Amino acid sequence: MVEQKVCIALVSGGIDSPVAVARMLREGWSIHPVHCSQEPITGPEAEQKTIAALRYFLEIESPLGDLARQNLSRELTVIPVAQQLSLFTEKWCHTEYFIHMKRLYCGLGDLVGTQKGATHLLTGENLGQVSSQTLGNLGAIEMMTSLRMLRPLLGIDKTVIMHMAQSMGTYELSLGPEVCDALGPSLPTTVANLEWLEKSEERAGGFQNLVEEAWKNHRIVQL
């Protein structure tokens, strides 16, 4: 029996994640998209861009569109995380803010994955592009999910990713200011200290509690 390929996709509203989704659709994966919303810290633009890109896949008349209509879920899970992220703006943990953010996202992806029967977590991460995506931090991030990681863009140059987005039609939909760093530090750490991360999360109420509290306010957007 061929194992069904099911993943949870963390879709941010930026340029990279729709490209990652498209690559995995072409590889035959069934995809359940998740968007972690930072409203009201930010505006609704990130969610709007996420919805626009996913609907584009479902509507285009092309081989990619055919794959999306077959394997991309028409339900986008939106999870508000602003309250949880604001806890990591204190002086004692702010330099690790982006790592805590991605760890939280992985924990939420894990929760959705359990419900959907997924085996993998898909991200648009690109090695070294930002602080949370250094080799020193990726391990500390992915340990918060039992799902295996799919990072199809990890070693691809950013300019190549932009060209890929342009060629498939999502680049314009994803343009706009990056909002994930709204509360982020000016000098983020590039090498995580796991013991300190865990102590900071415990001080903020405990990692599992942060995940559960964020999940209480999740909603479903029909694509």
What do the PLM-derived regions correspond to, one by one?
Residues 85-86, 91-168, 220:
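Active-site adenylate/phosphate-handling loop in enzymes that bind or generate adenylated species
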Residues 55-63, 114-115, 166-170, 188:
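Generic secondary-structure signature for well-ordered alpha-helical cores
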Residues 54-91, 178, 182:
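A conserved beta-strand->alpha-helix junction
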Residues 9, 33-35, 78, 123, ...:
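Structural beta-sheet core signal
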Residues 29-30, 72, 117:
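Short loop/turn motifs at secondary-structure junctions
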Residues 171-223:
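The feature marks non-catalytic terminal segments
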Residues 2-53, 186:
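ATP-dependent adenylation/pyrophosphate-handling site
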